[in-house]
Amino acid sequence: MTLQLKYSGMNVLRHHNLCNSKCVSGIVLSLVLGWAMVSFAAVDPRWSFESDGALRCDLDGKDSLPDKRVEFVTHGKRVIMRIFFPADDGNAMYVKGPEVQWPIFKRDVRDKSLIIPGKDTRSTDLPDIQVNGLPWVPSQRTAYRYDGFFQVLYAPQKGVRATRTLFPSIEQRMALQVWTLENTLSEPLKIEVPPVQETLLRRKAVDDKDWLVEYRVTGVAQQTLQPGDSVQFAVAYTARAEADSPLVIDPAREKKAYADLVGHAQSHLKLVTPDALLNNTFKWAKVRILLSNIETKAGLINTTGSMAYYCGFWANDNAEYTSPLVPLLGSADLEKGIDTMYRVWLKDIAEYGLKDKQITGSFESYNLKPYQRGRGDEAMILYGLSHYLLALADQTRAEEMWPLIVRCVDYLKLNLNSAGVIASRTDELEGRLPTGQANLSTSALAYGGLQVAARLGRQLGKTPQADQFDQFAKSLAQSIETFFGAKVQGYETYRYYEENDLLRGWISLPLVVGLTSRQAETLDALFSDKLWLEKPETLEVNLKAVSTEKRTQWARETYYALLAAFKSGRTDLALDKIRIALTSHMLGHGGPFADEDDSDLLSPTILYARVITEGLFGIEPLSFRSFQLTPRLPDSWPMMQLNAIQLLGRQLDLQVSRKGSDMNGAKISNGSPQSRPPACESGLKNGGRSCAEPQKYGSNMRMLAPFGSDILVRVLENGKELKSQTGKPGSVFEIKL
């Protein structure tokens, strides 16, 4: 049953009986103190939340989405694995293992170097398990679960319940599956799993040495398993030089190392809001991002997280998208990967020569061969690097990398066309769609990068250069308006290139970098049916790259549009649309991450995190000792927090609350907080449940406003308040440390 409701001036759909009592679906708008529970979806999502925020996909035959596959990519520093269960995988005897790759074999960008356990090498991925002396196989799968680790849960079979936990080794060339066998009977069972060490493949690696890919089972010596007890063993796929000793498989040690990374994601840059969907998807997105370093000949570098494009970096994915976020996560490993990437670029420009030459846009494969050029890469690098260095507030690294910023600016100046915008052969789509001789993305990113680079230059005592950057940015802003500003398909917005007569998704970028003259109609265009694709019946949601009937969805444009909406002060619109997008991307077809289809690219997941940091909270470094906040607290929220954020070399807690409430969101009356309903306590504190059903607060479904309109912003360090200011939602708060 689906009811049409009117919510904040927008039509939304409410679907009854959306999930069972164990979970709350992410499509629920978890709202406190009378805010309606609504949903856009006409079908149940594939994934739902458990009470601790873990994602769960129950295999109960009720999945109505057209694409039944479950797949995603994860990796450690020296191994990458794709966890994949095809749509027709209903036979319990067919237990597919992960697809595994190792960077050491990646000679060329087109070299897939794909090892597929269970295909050609082994008939199944099922270890030889003996129960009471007889062969044992697991029963049908009952659920998938993701809490940082991916688990496959099985129904009991002959008194044994199996669970498989799949994850990569953080440090070793090893992909692991840890099997847990539990005795569900009231009597003892004898369990035995013979150990296995089998060579699957011998091949030359990038170092021209002979390497072995091995299938290993740690095994279980015959033992008696008492009722309720369990035993574990590991299945591993490993790669090693033939001359080296076999890798030591220590499942407990490997699991702890991986759990430590998951713990970092849970405790750093911690989002606390009344919305369980945002809290939990943000948490799991951080796990995916923290796993984005991989080994190359230059050392660890930040990569795209993809099965197809692993072992390399790109000016758009890793500089433009990822760099601004990395300092906030407080991960030394991630910073190391970003630093190594920029040092490769520094070395390249030193060797490549004159400032009128294009900068290499990507370095691909284990040996980091230079590939792309002419995509506006200089603007992408300028934007990402300047944001990264200013947020780090590290004088030494900023001085080291400043020449790369100058080199990018010099090239951009040399490539101004007669209209004063930047000429570029193509953009990040690399010719998939027309871009003319000059495109909006390149000039908009250059404008945004110049502004931040000028701030950075002043911190380094390079005031004359900083002044030049500011002047360049001012001139470029005027040229963007004159050259790209246009009426397109009825909207006063931007054309993407000179001959362009169709709306393009990248019209969000001027809004992202602070160009506001065409803000209102640009947002209208972005979320019109010409660009915004929303199909409740299939949970399909994305922004089209171009307003045609052809399939041109590009998920990164979706999150840039959402960032633009928040930055433009359209908080309710942005919040509504981001919930819809997350339901589709993280709880629907692509769950549990927002990675792009086919390539499993990490970029949308990173951009989602930036929608929160830059959009919802409006974090923007101003200098090495100051930053500004523009908190866009939704009208229906009493509070929001972003805790343990690493910013300007300090670990801070950012807390925003409605004036007249405490930091937990309780309304204050006569000096003391009024208690919330228990369901709302759960929604705020454990992040796994939404607030109470709307009928408890009246049947008219109106959004109540129980708090004052002013907000209180507090900045804390180690529990000590550094700053406290009040103002209106959307006000700019400058914080000096």
Residue ranges and their predicted role:
Residues P464-T493, E521-R650:
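Non-catalytic carbohydrate-binding regions of carbohydrate-active enzymes
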Residues V272-N279, L325-Y342, L389-V406, A454-K474, ...:
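Structural helix-adjacent loops and short alpha-helical linkers that scaffold large soluble proteins
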Residues G26-A36:
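Bacterial N-terminal signal peptides
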Residues N183, Q223-L225, V231, Y310-A419, ...:
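Aromatic-rich carbohydrate-recognition surfaces in CAZymes
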Residues T224-Q226, L247-P251, H268-D275, C311, ...:
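Hydrophobic alpha-helical scaffolding
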Residues M1-S21:
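N-terminal secretory signal peptides that target proteins for export/translocation
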Residues N20, V38-N280, L328-A332, R570-A574, ...:
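Terminal accessory carbohydrate-recognition/targeting modules of carbohydrate-active enzymes
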Residues V272-F313, G337-R373, W402, C408-A438, ...:
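Extended glycan-interaction surfaces of carbohydrate-active proteins
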